[in-house]
Amino acid sequence: MKVKEVMVKEVATLDVNDELSLANDIMRLGRIRHLPVVDGTRLAGIISERDLFRSSLAQALGYGGQASRDLMKTLRIKDIMVQEVTTISPETNLCDAVRLMMDKKIGCLPVVENDRLVGLITETDVLLQYLKDCGADI
């Protein structure tokens, strides 16, 4: 089975110049843990809930609520995104993608074709496919 058969094709993305608070809002409201970051049409990085947590200096300093929100409005996505992103092709074998996620200890892989983001595959997508293959009602 190929990655293109399992990946999510409609992917929420962020621009490198978006405020960090936007990433927080999208992740919280959409229950999303990973967001690819684009610069035009080119994949520039990725940001995860873990990255947001690490960058929330206001929380680390004991501030909460509005102070944390104000800090997130001053930071840009490009300030905290992971720039060295492991990617795969839509034609990659699903087993190879799973092995790569396990080896790198990452929860998702952006799917790129001709330097353009075409999808995203996550641990959840793989588990859902497994359930389908087992004949489970989803």
PLM ranges: what are they?
Residues 1-10, 49-85, 98-102, 122-138:
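Tandem CBS (Bateman) regulatory domains
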Residues 14-31, 37-38, 87-105, 112, ...:
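The conserved cystathionine-beta-synthase
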Residues 17, 46, 71-74, 91, ...:
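Non-catalytic, surface-exposed connector residues within folded enzymatic/regulatory domains
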Residues 34-35, 41-42, 63-66, 73-75, ...:
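Short, surface-exposed, polar/charged, turn-prone segments marking secondary-structure boundaries
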Residues 19-23, 44-48, 62-68, 93-96:
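Short, functional N-terminal and low-complexity linear motifs
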Residues 27, 35-51, 101, 109-125:
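A glycine-centered beta-loop-beta connector
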